[in-house]
Curated annotation (Swiss-Prot):
<feature type="short sequence motif" description="Nuclear localization signal">
    <location>
        <begin position="203"/>
        <end position="216"/>
    </location>
</feature>
<dbReference type="InterPro" id="IPR001407">
    <property type="entry name" value="RNA_pol_PB1_influenza"/>
</dbReference>
<dbReference type="GO" id="GO:0039694">
    <property type="term" value="P:viral RNA genome replication"/>
</dbReference>
<dbReference type="GO" id="GO:0039523">
    <property type="term" value="P:symbiont-mediated suppression of host mRNA transcription via inhibition of RNA polymerase II activity"/>
</dbReference>
<dbReference type="Pfam" id="PF00602">
    <property type="entry name" value="Flu_PB1"/>
</dbReference>
<dbReference type="GO" id="GO:0003968">
    <property type="term" value="F:RNA-directed RNA polymerase activity"/>
</dbReference>
<feature type="region of interest" description="Disordered">
    <location>
        <begin position="53"/>
        <end position="82"/>
    </location>
</feature>
<keyword id="KW-0696">RNA-directed RNA polymerase</keyword>
<protein>
    <recommendedName>
        <fullName>RNA-directed RNA polymerase catalytic subunit</fullName>
        <ecNumber>2.7.7.48</ecNumber>
    </recommendedName>
</protein>
<keyword id="KW-0597">Phosphoprotein</keyword>
<keyword id="KW-1191">Eukaryotic host transcription shutoff by virus</keyword>
<keyword id="KW-0808">Transferase</keyword>
<feature type="compositionally biased region" description="Polar residues">
    <location>
        <begin position="55"/>
        <end position="64"/>
    </location>
</feature>
<dbReference type="InterPro" id="IPR007099">
    <property type="entry name" value="RNA-dir_pol_NSvirus"/>
</dbReference>
<comment type="subunit">
    <text>Influenza RNA polymerase is composed of three subunits: PB1, PB2 and PA. Interacts (via N-terminus) with PA (via C-terminus). Interacts (via C-terminus) with PB2 (via N-terminus); this interaction is essential for transcription initiation. Interacts (via C-terminus) with human PKP2 (via N-terminus); the interaction competitively inhibits the interaction between the RNA polymerase subunits PB1 and PB2.</text>
</comment>
<keyword id="KW-1190">Host gene expression shutoff by virus</keyword>
<keyword id="KW-1104">Inhibition of host RNA polymerase II by virus</keyword>
């Protein structure tokens, strides 16, 4: 029977059907090839928005820089980045007046964080620009490389393990006349194989020392590497995102800590909370505006969109904000916080891989690296690319483009939210001094504005005033893309509000299904997703039950583990049938071993092993969960694991799921092909790093949930811990005198070796 899809909506209120229009089913679009073009677009656009600013030259790097601050006031609706310092400072002052002590208290909280944060905070995060190798690396490796280079150049404050001390080294490094670095490289040689007599390519790994002069080092320290943002739905064009290096990251982290602390105290801020907490916060603001607009007042809401938020923001403005917020604080604290915006005012954007050329005869392909764009003949390029390159050329230095104005995506989300909220704060009647007033919500570049006034003219006047105030702070509300509605219907950060928030279920669609981690994790994540959607997203019992059945079906097809009594033939069915036949209690078999599904919507919170434990045959229990079974992966048995879920918008979020270690929780091995590439040295470093950390955690079993705070090195800490434990074990009779002496001797030897080093 054919179903007419419109029939599905007969009983559904229109606002609940909104989610069906979202582009969230199927695979998201990924970018291929180089991001060089997108990055040049960003750089050129940013300069265009600030073109009436003042040009200066950076004395250290020689980079040309454009400063639009306090530039001409806009005369049209075109986006522009001419923020006015005095207006920003005034907005900050009013924000403080409405929230007495907010900056003071947040500074005190941040100061505590600054003094306690360990360097390993910087190992969080994914790809990071590694300035020593001039390309992206996992954060932990990039940090390890940076510290290694610092130490070989005599910068050792970082050895205390505190982030603030690492940052002292960063500051120190910028004053050095030169920095020595070690780079990995590979040589390729064609040689004849003795056995097969064929020619083969032999690769040898090498490390070479290189010296960077002050200028080259500064350029690298100020570089943001760029990539194309992947998996963006609902857009035809891709765009570039930036990943900063380790020199910038620590400073940004402290600024964002302060800004986060402020955002937590602002009722209009959609950050840093998320999910239901965010919805509750938003609903409060709406309720306030609705109850205060009595019968005499009209209330309208703008679903707002800003034009190129990041490209019109300016680090110099952020510096002014920070200077104001920290004005009564100790000098060292103000200095630490002001470095991030100063570095961003002098930032360089790396243009990525460059362009790939193919000859017409298709026999030749060649890569033009970004470094060559400054000098190459432009006749090889098409018109649009030629225009881009011509425009960007004056800004190029060593393959990077000088980009003083603008912020890159996602760098100062919290701080830019504070800026946005400061405008919303100005909507109170005591500031507008007229009959209209406004309030709203801000979350990074997304906003919703609620305007109340006695009549339509008042509403219009309020919106105009808001629009102009934004312009003064370098924020450009898009008149084309924002729309206004009677209060009660609007959208904010993909939450749809219609007298309460409507579940936008389509956004969760990508996280349904089998994740592909391993049989154990996938089962757990699958049922957790369904459970979470019943709690948060109006997933009803009938639909949840159906989702569960579809998930189990999907799971069985993915892992070829159909029930033992099924007729379906797969590669595993022979083994599974054998197990099925010799099992007394068939209900106890896990789904991944061909067992039946015992999940229903009431028991989704119980891990499958626990759900079936009482039903299992004893020998099956013994095989499944025996720590001595070499196939049971016991890293650390933590009761909770984290899966990275990709929601339809916003950053990947961590989702917790119950983890029970069994023979099914295997970890796939690293692909071997990496071992032949120049990444190999990096990989060895990473394994070394891993081994040290594992060893450390053996000495301090609690370190997996609490970082040691102190200034001794890892080795010293382990030696002293070993001494204490040995003495306790000896005194309680757990070890013999000989063992005690031997361990103490080893400890002394280690200390002696450290001293000699």
């Amino acid at each position: 029977m054919d179903v007419n899809p419109t029939l599905l909506f007969l009983k559904v209120p229109a606002q609940n059907a909104i989610s069906t229009t979202f582009p969230y089913t199927g695979d998201p679009p990924y970018s291929h090839g180089t991001g060089t073009g997108y990055t040049m677009d960003t750089v050129n656009r940013t300069h265009q928005y600030s073109e009436k600013g003042r040009w200066t030259t950076n004395t250290e790097t020689g980079a040309p820089q454009l400063n639009p601050i306090d530039g001409p006031l806009p005369e049209d609706n075109e986006p522009s980045g001419y923020a006015q310092t005095d207006c920003v400072l005034e907005a900050m002052a009013f924000l403080e007046e409405s929230h007495p002590g907010i900056f003071e208290n947040s500074c005190i909280e941040t100061m505590e964080v600054v003094q306690q944060t360990r360097v390993d905070k910087l190992t969080q995060g994914r790809q990071t620009y590694d300035w020593t190798l001039n390309r992206n690396q996992p954060a932990a490796t990039a940090l390890a490389n940076t510290i290694e280079v610092f130490r070989s150049n005599g910068l050792t404050a970082n050895e205390s393990g505190r982030l603030i001390d690492f940052l002292k080294d960063v500051m120190e490094s910028m004053n050095k006349e030169e920095m020595g670095i070690t780079t990995h490289f590979q040589r390729k040689r064609r040689v004849r194989d003795n056995m097969t007599k064929k020619m083969i390519t032999q690769r040898t790994m090498g490390k070479k020392k290189q010296r960077l002069n002050k200028r080259s080092y500064l350029i690298r320290a100020l570089t943001l590497n760029t990539m194309t943002k992947d998996a963006e739905r609902g857009k035809l064009k891709r765009r570039a995102i930036a990943t900063p290096g380790m020199q910038i990251r620590g400073f940004v982290y402290f600024v964002e800590t302060l800004a986060r602390s402020i955002c937590e105290k602002l009722e209009q801020s959609g950050l840093p909370v998320g999910g239901n907490e965010k919805k509750a916060k938003l609903a409060n603001v709406v309720r306030k505006m609705m109850t205060n607009s009595q019968d005499t007042e009209l209330s309208f809401t703008i679903t707002g969109d800003n034009t190129k938020w990041n490209e019109n923001q300016n680090p110099r403005m952020f510096l002014a904000m920070i200077t104001y917020m920290t004005r009564n604080q100790p000098e060292w604290f103000r200095n630490v916080l002001s470095i991030a915006p100063i570095m961003f005012s002098n930032k360089m954007a790396r243009l990525g891989k460059g362009y790939m050329f193919e000859s017409k005869s298709m026999k030749l392909r060649t890569q033009i690296p970004a470094e060559m764009l400054a000098s190459i003949d432009l006749k090889y390029f098409n018109d649009s690319t030629r225009k881009k390159i011509e425009k960007i050329r004056p800004l190029l230095i060593e393959g990077t483009a000088s980009l003083s104005p603008g912020m890159m995506m996602g760098m100062f989300n919290m701080l830019s939210t504070v800026l946005g909220v400061s405008i919303l704060n100005l909507g109170q009647k005591r500031y507008t001094k007229t009959t209209y007033w406004w309030d709203g919500l801000q979350s990074s570049d997304d906003f919703a504005l609620i305007v109340n006034a006695p009549n339509h003219e008042g509403i219009q006047a309020g919106v105009d005033r808001f629009y102009r105030t934004c312009k003064l702070l370098g924020i450009n509300m898009s008149k084309k893309k924002s729309y206004i509605n009677r209060t009660g219907t609007f959208e904010f950060t993909s939450f749809f509000y219609r007298y309460g928030f409507v579940a936008n279920f389509s956004m969760e669609l990508p996280s349904f299904g089998v994740s592909g981690i391993n049989e154990s994790a996938d089962m757990s994540i699958g049922v957790t997703v369904i459970k979470n959607n019943m709690i948060n997203n109006d997933l009803g019992p009938a639909t949840a039950q159906m989702a569960l059945q579809l998930f189990i079906k999907d799971y069985r097809y993915t892992y070829r583990c159909h029930r033992g009594d099924t007729q379906i033939q797969t590669r595993r069915s022979f083994e599974i049938k054998k197990l099925w036949e010799q099992t007394r209690s068939k209900a106890g078999l896990l789904v991944s071993d061909g067992g039946p599904n015992l999940y229903n919507i009431r028991n989704l919170h119980i891990p499958e092993v626990c759900l079936k434990w009482e039903l299992m045959d004893e020998d099956y229990q013994g095989r499944l969960c025996n720590p001595l079974n070499p196939f049971v992966s016991h890293k650390e048995i933590e009761s909770m694991n984290n899966a990275v879920m990709m929601p339809a918008h916003g950053p990947a979020k961590n989702m917790e799921y119950d983890a029970v270690a069994t023979t099914h929780s295997w970890i796939p091995k690293r692909n071997r092909s990496i071992l032949n590439t120049s990444q190999r040295g990096v990989l060895e470093d990473e394994q070394m790093y891993q081994r040290c950390c594992n060893l450390f955690e053996k000495f301090f079993p609690s370190s997996s949930y609490r970082r040691p705070v102190g200034i001794s090195s890892m080795v010293e800490a382990m030696v002293s811990r070993a001494r204490i434990d040995t003495r306790i074990d000896f005194e309680s009779g757990r070890i013999k005198k000989e063992e005690f002496t031997e361990i103490m001797k080893i400890c002394s030897t280690i200390e002696e070796l450290r001293r000699q080093k």
